[in-house]
């Protein structure tokens, strides 16, 4: 299993405990140090391209990475590299923000957001990249289904017209930002490289 952009290694620790052979791909020297202190295997590399051989991975996981691509060409290359690096039958898990829900906050929450991610754009990107899309899940934090829908409805209150103006007068701008950030909707895609997985 390869994770692109592993953060502080939460998934990596769980994967190793579950018996997976895990490798993180990271660029930040600070995070690389944190990951190695946790005993995780790390490759220092920018992506794309991916620092893996052809058909080297059973699973590639990328959580909130694609929206940081410089544009469609980099997003296509990222997807092509995932396809190249996966074994036939391997799975690509991709988590991205849902721009259609976030709109202006997509840009405000992180200045490095460049590539707009929506359900349809992501489906097209993955299909055009040669993947079979098996599933898409909408989430707010770890909440999905009805719980996500309830949180999404609650989010309407912090996005009412005048909330930003009022927050400036009441000194609650940072609080409103944090609430919006915690109610940020993501899309998780499970995609599969066509072909039969090799039998072990």
Segment roles from a protein language model:
Residues 114-130:
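Short alpha-helix
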Residues 42, 133-136:
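Generic structural signal for residues in well-ordered beta-strands
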Residues 72, 115-116, 181-182:
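Short, solvent-exposed loop/helix junctions and linker helices
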Residues 99-100, 105-107, 169, 174:
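Short leucine-rich amphipathic alpha-helices used at interfaces
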Residues 1-104, 119-123, 189-193:
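Conserved SAM-binding loop
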């Amino acid at each position: 299993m390869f994770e692109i952009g592993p953060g502080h290694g939460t998934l990596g620790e769980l994967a190793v405990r579950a018996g997976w052979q895990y490798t993180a791909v990271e660029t930040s020297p600070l995070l690389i140090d944190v990951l190695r202190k946790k005993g995780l295997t790390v490759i220092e590399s920018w992506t794309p391209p991916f620092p893996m051989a052809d058909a080297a991975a059973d699973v590639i996981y990328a959580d909130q990475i694609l929206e940081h691509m410089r544009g469609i060409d980099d997003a296509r290359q990222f997807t092509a590299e995932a396809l190249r690096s996966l074994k036939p039958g391997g799975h690509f898990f991709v988590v991205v923000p849902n721009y259609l829900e976030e709109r202006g906050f997509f840009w405000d929450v992180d200045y490095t957001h460049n590539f707009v991610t929506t359900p349809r754009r992501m489906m097209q990107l993955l299909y055009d990249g040669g993947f079979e899309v098996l599933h898409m899940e909408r989430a707010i934090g770890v909440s999905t289904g009805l719980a996500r829908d309830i949180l999404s409805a609650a989010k309407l209150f912090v996005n009412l017209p005048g909330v930003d103006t009022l927050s400036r007068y009441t000194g609650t701008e940072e609080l409103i930002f944090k609430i919006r950030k915690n109610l940020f909707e993501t899309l998780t895609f499970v995609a599969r490289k066509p072909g039969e997985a090799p039998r072990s």
